[in-house]
Amino acid sequence: METALAKTPQKRQVMFLAILLLLWEAGSEAVRYSIPEETESGYSVANLAKDLGLGVGELATRGARMHYKGNKELLQLDIKTGNLLLYEKLDREVMCGATEPCILHFQLLLENPVQFFQTDLQLTDINDHAPEFPEKEMLLKIPESTQPGTVFPLKIAQDFDIGSNTVQNYTISPNSHFHVATHNRGDGRKYPELVLDKALDREERPELSLTLTALDGGAPPRSGTTTIRIVVLDNNDNAPEFLQSFYEVQVPENSPLNSLVVVVSARDLDAGAYGSVAYALFQGDEVTQPFVIDEKTAEIRLKRALDFEATPYYNVEIVATDGGGLSGKCTVAIEVVDVNDNAPELTMSTLSSPTPENAPETVVAVFSVSDPDSGDNGRMICSIQNDLPFLLKPTLKNFYTLVTQRTLDRESQAEYNITITVTDMGTPRLKTEHNITVLVSDVNDNAPAFTQTSYTLFVRENNSPALHIGSVSATDRDSGTNAQVTYSLLPPQNPHLRLASLVSINADNGHLFALRSLDYEALQAFEFRVGATDRGSPALSSEALVRVLVLDANDNSPFVLYPLQNGSAPCTELVPRAAEPGYLVTKVVAVDGDSGQNAWLSYQLLKATEPGLFSMWAHNGEVRTARLLSERDAAKHRLVVLVKDNGEPPRSATATLHVLLVDGFSQPYLPLPEAAPAQAQADSLTVYLVVALASVSSLFLFSVLLFVAVRLCRRSRAAPVGRCSVPEGPFPGHLVDVSGTGTLSQSYHYEVCLTGDSGAGEFKFLKPIIPNLLPQGAGEEIGKTAAFRNSFGLN
C-alpha cells in the first residue's frame, strides 16, 4: 500500500500537522474554562462571545456552533446571549478516567466566513466516589514463629477520584498484635502493609479477625472497609522470595488470547509443604485485569484482548504463597505496544450544499480527522480526487476545510461526488473513505438563447383576428427561476409600423398571434424583433428577428381598364367589312390587384351576336376577326368578354364590346354623354392620355374636317354607314378626337371623350388607318387599302 501511495504524488495531499495550524483569523491561544464535575445541565460556563471579542449578533449571522470530537453535544452556545451552557451533567471519571488534568477540547466554528476558536473545558474532581477494596475479606496465614516487625502486604483499595479525593490513609481496628503502615506507590497511589507488633501464639489464639479501613482526603472524607482474617500456623521458617521484585515487559496490543506474557519465579527455602509455592494475582480483579497466572508454573498469559488506546500500561502484582501461608510479592509492569489496528476516523462538522457556482474559494465542508493510534500509526494524510475543482486546507489541529479551487459551472456539471480519503502512516497503512455530494447552485450567468436567430412566418391574407401565426422559442441553460423565460415584442425600428395593432406574443410560451386581418395588397411583409428575458437577478435577455410574409389570397376580381365599364355610353369598335381573318378589332385591357398566379388573367369570348365571327386570344385580350366578313353579316355586334384570374377559386369580370361593321367612314360618330361641368382635376389615366394625345390634336382635327368635307362632296358615291347619334357638325368643345396615340399600337385612331365632371376618360377604337396585320392576301389587301385611302383623298 505504501508503494501504491508513493506512486501518486500528483494527488493533492494535506499532511497532518502535530501543532495547531491557524486559520487566517483565529488566535493561537485557547480560551480555557474550569467547572467541577457533576455540575447540573444548563449551567452557564461563561460568556464566550465576550471573551472572544465577538458581537452577540455576529454569532447568529455567522452560524456559530460548538464542536466536540465525534460531534457529541456536551456544550451548547446560546447565540442570542453568547453564553456557553452545559448541555448535560459531566462525569470526570467517565470522560477522562485516571488522566489528570481532565481537559475537554472544544472548537467554536463560525461558518460565514469560516473561522475557528479553540476552547478548553477543565473538569475538576469532586469526592463522589468512596474507596472500595477488591475483596470483602483477605486471608493471611502467619506462622506463630514469625518475628515482630515482619511486614505482610495487603491489597489496596480502589478510589476513582483523583488527587486529594483518592485514598490517603489506611487504618486497622484496634488490636495488640498488628498495625497498618501506609506507603506511596510509584504511580502515586497509596498501599497498605500489615506490620506484626507482637508475636503470635497459636495455642493462645489460633485465628484473628481485623477490619481494614481506607480513607480518602475529601471533605467530608469517604471510606471503605474489608476484613482481614489471620490464621496462626505452626512454624514455617522461610517465606517465598521472587527472583526479581520488579518485572518489565512489552506486549503488542494485537497479541492473541492465551499468549504468554512473562514467567515469574519465586523460591522458598523450606522443604515439604512449606517449600511448595503457589502463584496468584495479588489484586485478583477479574474485571480490570486482562491477564491470568498459572498458580504452579507462574506463566502470565493473556485472557482478554488488549487495547492500547484504552489502557496503554498495566501494573500487575503477583503474590507467591507457600504451604505454610507465608507469601512474597512482586510487580510486573506491562507496557502495551501500539499497533496500527485503528483506521482513521472522519467526522463531518458542516457541509454547505448547494454551493454557488460563481464563488471561488468557498468553504464547502468542514471536517475533523482522528486516529487513536500513536506515533506514525496516528499520523494521517488527507486527499481527494485529482480531477476535481476543490482543495483541502488544514485549519486547526485535526480540522480541514474543503474549498472550491475556482469558479464552478453548474451548466457543465451540476453536482460533484467527492471522496475524502484519510490514510495513516502506520504499517500496514489503514485508510478511511468518506463520500460527500456537493450540489452546485445556479447563478443567473446565461442569457436565454433562441433556437433560431431569425424566424420567417407565413400568413395568408384575410386571416381571422387572433390567429396563431407561429411561435418563437428560447431556452436558458440556467435552472429554476433563472431559466424561466418571458417573451415580449421589442419596439420596431420602423416608426411607421404599428406593430402593436398587428401582432401580439404570449409572454409564457412565445406564441405569436395576428391581431387583425391582414391585407396583402396593403402590406406584403413586415419584420420586428422579439425579446426573451429570464427571471434571474439581474435579468438577462436576448432577441431574435421575426419576418412575417403575407401570402396573397385571391380576394380581388379582375378590373377592366379598357373598355371602361362605368355605365356610360358604350364604346363601339368600327371594323371594315373588307377586314381579313385575324384582323385586330380591339384589345381588352384588365388588371388584378392580387399577385402571382392570382393575377394571371385569361380572356374568353363569353357571348357574341354572331358566334364564330370574332375570336379572342386568351392571354393578351386581343379581339380579332375569325373569318372574312360578308354583306350578310349584321352591321352591329355585341360581344361579352369574360376576364378570369388563375386563383383558387378563380374570380372573373365581364366587359361588353360593341362592334360596327362598316364599308366606309362617313360620319362615324357615336352618341356621347351629355357634357358636364368642368372638373378641377382629371383622372390620372385621363391626364396621361390627354398629355399624350394633345401633341397630335391639331392633326386629328384637320383630318376630321377633311373627312367631313370629302363626304359631303361625294355623298352620291358612298352611302352613309354607322352614323353616330350625335348632331352633325363640329365636336362639342369638351371633346377631343385623337389619332395615332395611346397605349395601343400607333396604327389605330382613337376617339377620346373627356367629360369634365366624371374625372375619367372614355376612349374607343375607331378603325385602323393602316392595318397592322397582313393576312395571306396581302397584295389584294394593300390594293383595297390604297383605294380606301384614295376615297378620303389622303394620297
Swiss-Prot record:
It is a single-pass type I membrane protein. It comes from Homo sapiens (Human). Its main location: membrane. The keyword Transmembrane helix applies. Potential calcium-dependent cell-adhesion protein. May be involved in the establishment and maintenance of specific neuronal connections in the brain. Residues 31-689 are extracellular. The chain crosses the membrane at residues 690-710. PANTHER family: CADHERIN-87A, PROTOCADHERIN BETA-5. Residues 35-133, 138-242, 247-346, 351-450, 455-560, 567-670 form the Cadherin domain. It is found in: Cell membrane. GO terms for molecular function: calcium ion binding. The modification N6-acetyllysine is found at K296. InterPro entries: Cadherin-like_dom, Cadherin-like_sf, Cadherin_C, Cadherin_CS, Cadherin_N, Protocadherin/Cadherin-CA. This is Protocadherin beta-5. One of its GO terms (cellular component) is membrane. GO terms for biological process: calcium-dependent cell-cell adhesion via plasma membrane cell adhesion molecules; cell adhesion; chemical synaptic transmission; homophilic cell adhesion via plasma membrane adhesion molecules; synapse assembly. Residues 711-795 are cytoplasmic. Glycans are attached at N169, N417, N435, N566. Residues 1-30 form the signal peptide. Keywords: Acetylation, Calcium, Cell adhesion, Cell membrane, Glycoprotein, Membrane, Repeat, Signal, Transmembrane, Transmembrane helix. Gene3D superfamilies: Cadherins (2.60.40.60). SMART domains: CA (SM00112).
